[in-house]
């Protein structure tokens, strides 16, 4: 029996509430500052895992104490998850990073049945939690004190622009009848829970978005992982497990002509997916993230009810906000179309800000309306898409692994990975001239850190871990030689 580790974190509210600050999510006008303090239940001297399977946070919001329970989202990545980028001469470089010990969690607030949470613990705490109907983002503050975090409400983030943002799918008003019919169906509690379904997701990042983030592969990877974690959390009430199967970044050029007309781009992307992407690895649904400004304030487009179709199980989404959550809502919205959902009708669905609203809101909900659930249930009943019946397997891969599994193999001096890595040549897996290392807690700018440099702060009664000066690895329990 595997024991679940329970970790308690106390978040002490800083003595003041900030009035305005620029965060990764944008300019926030009102926020609270909190300090995570970790208290581990591990026995004295035990090795601390990098990311625990389960955690518990205690903190205050608006003066009220809450308890946040988190569990690692163990199904977030497929077993053969891969990342692809391209060399300047056009060669495809595919890596298979180890993602088992990842840092993405989902959870809930104690004694709040409607609460949810989606948190990244990669570098501090970043994500959101829903408490008493309100959604609160949390993210680290870039201060000298690295433990400081901000908690705020989405409506306190200044708008990035005043133009309305909307889905480009044209409402099929004749489909209102299907809502009525679906709504008239009596669903037992068992049916309302929805059968378990699994969607293997492929994310493609176009060249415009790649350059938008300074051609920084790691930054894009982190952003996409956070998006998929959020999508997974939003789909949980439908009993859908989202698994990221592959990330393909067009680092040198676009492989289709990304046009201002979103449906045209979706058609081109669907053709490319059928011809190229599906031959690399099997997956159920693919989305293209782009920095292209679509016409008519469109931020996303997808085919309705075409999940599992080799050409039409696709969507195109503009990376329209600095807020990861807002883009993730759009991606979930377009996924909803592929699962048979139409836009919410204001008169019938009683939810102006739910996921399938045609226009995105500053107070965007992370919930599917009853109408969306009826559409989805009808789609499952009538179409019964086969590709989402089974959990992802290793046999879903149809290509040969290349490199980049975060382990050094025979002939490798460093693990092939991001093309912008200044220390490791991604094409040869060799250290670049003058480099001692490519990654590790004791590696800084391709050189070993000095002996006795702290690389991991003490926890409990354990001493600080310090670098040896001879390796990029950070030894445990203060053994630095």
UniProtKB/Swiss-Prot annotation:
Tissue specificity as recorded in UniProt: Expressed by the venom gland.
Gene Ontology CC, one term: plasma membrane
Modified residues (Pyrrolidone carboxylic acid (Glu)): 190
Keywords for this protein: Cell adhesion impairing toxin, Disulfide bond, Fibrinogenolytic toxin, Fibrinolytic toxin, Hemorrhagic toxin, Hemostasis impairing toxin, Hydrolase, Metal-binding, Metalloprotease, Platelet aggregation inhibiting toxin, Protease, Pyrrolidone carboxylic acid, Secreted, Signal, Toxin, Zinc, Zymogen
Propeptide stretches in the record: 21-189, 393-410
Compartments (UniProt record): Secreted
Signal peptide: 1-20
Domain Disintegrin span(s) in chain numbering: 400-481
PROSITE patterns in the cross-refs: ADAM_MEPRO (PS50215), DISINTEGRIN_1 (PS00427), DISINTEGRIN_2 (PS50214), ZINC_PROTEASE (PS00142)
Top-rank lineage group of the source organism: Eukaryota
Pfam family, one: Disintegrin
Ranges of residues in domain Peptidase M12B: 197-392
EC category name: hydrolase
InterPro entries referenced in this protein's UniProt entry, alphabetically: Disintegrin_CS, Disintegrin_dom, Disintegrin_dom_sf, MetalloPept_cat_dom_sf, Peptidase_M12B, Peptidase_M12B_N, Reprolysin_adamalysin
Post-translational modification as stated in the protein's UniProt record: The N-terminus is blocked.
Binding site for Zn(2+): 333, 337, 343
Short motif Cell attachment site, span: 459-461
E.C. code: 3.4.24.-
The record's free-text note on cofactor binding: Binds 1 zinc ion per subunit.
Active site: 334
Bridged cysteine pairs (disulfide): 308-387, 349-371, 351-354, 414-429, 416-424, 423-446, 437-443, 442-467, 455-474
Activity regulation, free text: Inhibited by EDTA and 1,10-phenanthroline. Is also inhibited by endogenous tripeptide inhibitors pyroGlu-Asn-Trp, pyroGlu-Gln-Trp, and pyroGlu-Lys-Trp.
Anything else known: This disintegrin is 100% identical to the disintegrin of AC E9NW27, another disintegrin of the P-II subfamily of Protobothrops mucrosquamatus. The disintegrin belongs to the medium disintegrin subfamily.
Stated family: Belongs to the venom metalloproteinase (M12B) family. P-II subfamily. P-IIa sub-subfamily.
Record's subunit section: Monomer.
Record protein name field: Zinc metalloproteinase/disintegrin
């Amino acid at each position: 029996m595997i024991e679940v580790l329970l970790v308690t974190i106390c978040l002490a509210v800083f003595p003041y509430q900030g009035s305005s600050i620029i965060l990764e999510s944008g300019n926030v006008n009102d926020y609270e500052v909190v300090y995570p303090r970790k208290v581990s239940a591990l026995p004295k001297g035990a090795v601390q895992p990098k990311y625990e399977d389960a955690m518990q946070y205690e903190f205050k919001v608006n003066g009220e104490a809450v308890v946040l329970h988190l569990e690692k989202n163990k199904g977030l990545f497929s077993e053969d998850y891969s990342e692809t980028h391209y060399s300047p001469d056009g060669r495809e470089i595919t890596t298979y990073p180890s993602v088992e010990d990842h840092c993405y969690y989902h959870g809930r607030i104690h004694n709040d049945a409607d609460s949810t949470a989606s948190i990244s613990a990669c570098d501090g705490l970043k994500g959101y939690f829903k408490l008493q109907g309100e959604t609160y983002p949390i993210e680290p503050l870039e201060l000298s004190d690295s433990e400081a975090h901000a908690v705020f409400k989405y409506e306190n983030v200044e708008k990035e622009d005043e133009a309305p943002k909307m889905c480009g799918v044209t409402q099929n008003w004749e489909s209102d009848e299907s809502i009525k019919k679906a709504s008239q169906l009596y669903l037992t509690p068992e049916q309302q829970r929805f059968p378990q379904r699994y969607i293997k997701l492929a994310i493609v990042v176009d060249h415009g978005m790649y350059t938008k983030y300074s051609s920084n592969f790691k930054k894009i990877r982190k952003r996409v992982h956070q998006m998929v974690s959020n999508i997974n959390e939003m789909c949980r009430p439908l009993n859908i497990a989202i698994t990221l199967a592959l990330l393909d970044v067009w680092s040198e050029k676009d492989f289709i002509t990304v046009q201002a007309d979103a449906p045209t781009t979706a058609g081109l992307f669907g053709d490319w997916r059928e011809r190229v992407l599906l031959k690399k690895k099997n997956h159920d649904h693919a989305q293209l993230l782009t920095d292209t400004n679509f016409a008519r304030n469109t931020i996303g487009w997808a085919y309705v009810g075409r999940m599992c179709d080799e050409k039409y199980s696709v969507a195109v989404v503009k990376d329209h906000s600095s807020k990861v959550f807002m883009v993730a809502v759009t991606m979930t919205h377009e996924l909803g179309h592929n699962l048979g959902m139409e836009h919410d009708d204001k008169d019938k669905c009683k939810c102006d800000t739910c996921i399938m609203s045609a226009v995105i809101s500053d107070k965007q909900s992370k919930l599917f309306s009853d109408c969306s659930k009826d559409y989805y249930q009808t789609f499952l009943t009538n179409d019964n898409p086969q590709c989402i019946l089974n959990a992802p397997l290793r046999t879903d891969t149809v290509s040969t692994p290349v490199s980049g599994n975060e382990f050094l193999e025979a002939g490798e001096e460093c693990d092939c990975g991001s093309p912008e890595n200044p220390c490791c040549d991604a094409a040869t897996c060799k250290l670049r001239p003058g480099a001692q290392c490519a990654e590790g807690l004791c590696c800084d700018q391709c050189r070993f850190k000095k002996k006795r440099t702290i690389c991991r702060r003490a926890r409990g009664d354990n001493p600080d871990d310090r670098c040896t000066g001879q390796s990029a690895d950070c030894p445990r329990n203060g053994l630095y030689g």
